């Protein structure tokens, strides 16, 4: 690189890096919505397989009493409740409601709280 090209290259503005970017509730929930969608696909497949096997062998059914399996089932139910609540939020966005910054933040926190409450309701 010539000296002039190097000087021009050094004076170019740089974009902010992810380390200085403050995550917003909307971006965090968007990423989490995608992750739970993929996770639910695989977990439901495993759950159906487990239920089919438990029909033929009671040992698989006894796994449900294991503490680790219960924790996984609670995590699965939270993921399902979160994905459901955030999906409803997206349906409202599809019809044009809730696009202001304030509404996005409020509905984002409502999704988090409602999914926790629904999960607790399922397990109590």
Swiss-Prot record:
GO cellular component terms, A-Z: plasma membrane
Residues reported in the UniProt entry to bind heme: 83
Membrane topology per record: Multi-pass membrane protein
Broad class of the protein's primary localization: membrane
GO molecular function: electron transfer activity; metal ion binding
Annotated Pfam families: Sdh_cyt
Transmembrane stretches, start-end: 30-55, 68-88, 104-124
PROSITE patterns: SDH_CYT_1, SDH_CYT_2
Membrane-side (Periplasmic) residue stretches: 56-67
Taxonomic superkingdom: Bacteria
Entry coiled-coil feature ranges: none
GO biological process: tricarboxylic acid cycle
Signal peptide extent: none
Cofactor binding mode and count: The heme is bound between the two transmembrane subunits.
Cofactor requirement: heme
Subcellular location: Cell inner membrane
Key words, A-Z: Cell inner membrane, Cell membrane, Electron transport, Heme, Iron, Membrane, Metal-binding, Transmembrane, Transmembrane helix, Transport, Tricarboxylic acid cycle
NCBIfam families xref list: succ_dehyd_cytB
Protein family per UniProt: Belongs to the cytochrome b560 family.
Complex formation: Part of an enzyme complex containing four subunits: a flavoprotein, an iron-sulfur protein, plus two membrane-anchoring proteins, SdhC and SdhD. The complex can form homotrimers.
Role: Membrane-anchoring subunit of succinate dehydrogenase (SDH).
UniProt-recorded name of the protein: Succinate dehydrogenase cytochrome b556 subunit
Taxonomic placement: Bacteria, Pseudomonadati, Pseudomonadota, Alphaproteobacteria, Rickettsiales
Gene, per the UniProt record: sdhC
